[in-house]
Amino acid sequence: MDRYGETQDPRVTDSIPRAAVDQILQAAAALDSSDGKATFDDVRQLLRQRSSRRAPASREAMWTVARDALSDLQKLRYATIGVLPRKRSEVERLRATPCELTESGRALARLFAEKQGRARAFDELLVAWMNEHRYFRLFNRRLLLGPLYVPDVTTVKQVGSPAQASPLAERVIATCSTRLAIVGYPEAKREIFAAAVRERVAYVEAQSSLSDPDPKKWIDIIENLVVIPAFLATENLPFDAVTFQQLIRVSQDFLSASWTSSYPGFEGRVIFATCDFRPAVVNESDRVEQVVHHGKRYATTGFKQALRGGHQQLAGSQGGYVDAYALRALGCVQLSIPPAVFAHCLDEMIRAGPASGMVIYTELPFTPPPPGEAYVEIGNRRIGLIKVAAANGG
């Protein structure tokens, strides 16, 4: 049994669908619109029509998304699905594969179709994922224990060039361990991480060359085949780098977790929970029944103090303007709230003015947000700098 109360059986794996959460719900809606029954190709075509991406109008477009969405509905007992294509060459033969919603699947689809029910449909699916997708459960339970500080390697500057004589493993360990130590990552876990890095570098070097002259390709290999696998092994998370990234994306879709690369003092990603589950999942047999999101009401109590404390931490004794992305990162991680909730709470304090006990000044951004993050926006106005001052001695 691992530290999260789960039985670690190396034979037990999980398949995380490569479809977005809303696409899974759209697949259910497509089936429900035809009296609960349709074919694989019917669902594929509907998903292509509703896609915001420009998928080509071919007879195979988005077949993997349709397959993964339908497979997940079956896994969660929302549908009964026939044989689905595992590779492109099977798509034509299996177009007419029958798909039928169960009663619970039809109820989910109808909830999703209601304007006021969409959020509840997402939450119902989130609860089902927590109970049925082992990797998703492990990932979110780990976040409930505290944020994950991921020491990503994204530039040659962090580890030096391939031509350097010093051992690559030691360079990776040096840059990652230094950053992890800054955020208080336990020494014992840093030692486990270092051992895992050495093992991964040795394995990759035995399989292929790590002296590729293309810097981007070289860094991608180090990040995806060395750093992330070593970090996941240290955290006792039994999935690969691709699944890890998919779990982050799906958790954002569900509003169960978020991430930032703007956290001050740490060069890397910080991934953190943005909800709780009821009852609390203590061991493998516990089943989740309800999700409690960390919304505006949840954040209101501690937001003022978190904003003031974050500003003081960043501005120091000068008390001037600070980077809005860094301030948002501090507030979101401390309060375990999504960026959108941070923006809502900030907007309310700005509107309240001196009555809130502080005055908040803002300036437009001089730089775009880090890759993967959105602007800090209040209404239609983007904010890049923030200054917090006491009002009337408050």
Protein language model features and the residues they cover:
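An N-terminal amphipathic alpha-helical segment
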Residues: Y298-V322
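C-terminal engagement modules used by replication, chromatin/transcription, nuclear envelope/ESCRT
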Residues: Y263-S285, A352-G394
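Short amphipathic alpha-helical elements of helix-turn-helix/winged-helix folds
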Residues: Q23-S34, A306-L314, L330
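Donor-sugar nucleotide-binding helix/loop cap in glycosyltransferases
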Residues: M1-T300
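Short glycine-rich, basic-tinged beta-strand/loop micro-motifs
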Residues: A315-I337
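Short, hydrophobic/π-rich interface segment
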Residues: L330-F366
